Regions:
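Conserved pre-ATP/AMP-binding loop-to-beta segment of ANL
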Residues: 25-44, 51, 94-102
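Short beta-strand->loop structural element characteristic of the AMP-binding/adenylate-forming
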Residues: 2, 53-56, 128-134, 204
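ANL superfamily adenylate-forming
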Residues: 1-36, 63
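Short Gly/Pro-enriched turn/cap motifs at secondary-structure boundaries
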Residues: 33, 229-234
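Beta-strand->loop->alpha-helix junctions that form or flank phosphate-binding loops
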Residues: 1-8, 203-211, 232-234
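Conserved AMP-binding A3 loop
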Residues: 40-80
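Conserved AMP-binding/adenylation subdomain of ANL enzymes
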Residues: 63-106, 110-150, 165
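Gly/Ser/Thr-rich phosphate-binding loop
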Residues: 124-127, 146-154, 163-226, 239, ...
Length: 248
């Protein structure tokens, strides 16, 4: 484990990236020109064909996804779900968290959800990132309690398995402010189950694609509860077009 751009004390067995650079031969790490539309990652995705293809994600798209996730105001962008007028000021949907931000990524980091939609925003926020070696709901509940996880974003089956696990009733999950994710539709019944199970937290969902560097639409809290089958409105930097079977 390497610490980057921090003066804080690091855990035993970890080091600092600056120390690694200091030991390197300057000629080994040449200066590289990087453009905003250069590739930053290649994620292999099966899409709808079932055969993995390497999707090339750019710096511009990945940074835009971070800002979409961090700056999107659901109270404004999801207003029509409850018929709220533009000038209305909705009441807060959740109480401020008493815990520092801690994101759990139960899906692999080679997937756009975990990397671009969890790791990147968590890094920008300076939040804790909690990883799992493999998915096991009992172990995940243990980590949620121990690490005081505030946001869990996985596939819907993961949320359902957590709520159905016998340890849900005995583990302290009061730190959870948000629970949901993407990768598949968040079923309406699960939306209401999450809303009823969390102690002050809210369900969340979204739709995205690897090729768009992350999310396309997002929905959460009272607006998702009001329209649990909705994936939400578009994020600020994307456009959508509806096309019927005749291409219209």
């Amino acid at each position: 484990i390497l610490g980057v751009r921090t003066d804080r004390a690091l855990p035993a067995g970890s080091g600092r990236w600056a120390d690694v650079l200091a030991m390197a031969d300057p000629g080994v790490l040449p200066t590289v020109e990087i453009g905003t539309d250069d590739d930053v990652t290649i994620f292999y995705t099966s899409g709808t064909t079932g055969f993995p293809k390497g999707a090339q994600l750019t710096h511009r798209g990945s940074v835009a996804n971070i800002f979409n996730m961090l700056t999107m105001t659901m109270a404004a962008n999801s207003a029509e779900a409850k018929g709220i007028a533009a000038g209305d000021i909705p009441a807060p949907t959740t109480a401020p968290s008493a815990y520092p931000a801690a994101f759990m990524a139960p899906t692999p980091l080679f997937h756009v959800t975990a990397c671009n939609c969890i790791l990147h925003p968590a890094t920008v926020m300076g939040a804790k990132l909690v990883l799992t070696y493999k998915w096991e709901p009992g172990r995940a509940l243990e980590l949620i309690e121990r690490e005081r996880v505030t946001t869990l974003s996985g596939v819907p089956t993961m949320s359902r398995e957590l709520l159905l696990h016998p340890d849900w009733e005995t583990r302290d999950t009061s730190s959870l402010q948000g629970m949901g994710g993407g990768g598949a539709p968040l079923q309406p019944d699960l939306v209401h189950k999450i809303a009823g199970a969390l102690k002050g937290g809210q369900p969340s969902t979204g739709y995205g694609m690897t090729e768009t560097c992350g999310i396309i639409t997002a929905n959460s809290a009272r607006w998702l509860i009001a329209k649990p089958a909705s994936c939400g409105p578009l994020v600020p930097t994307l456009e959508a077009k509806f096309v019927d079977e005749d291409g219209n």
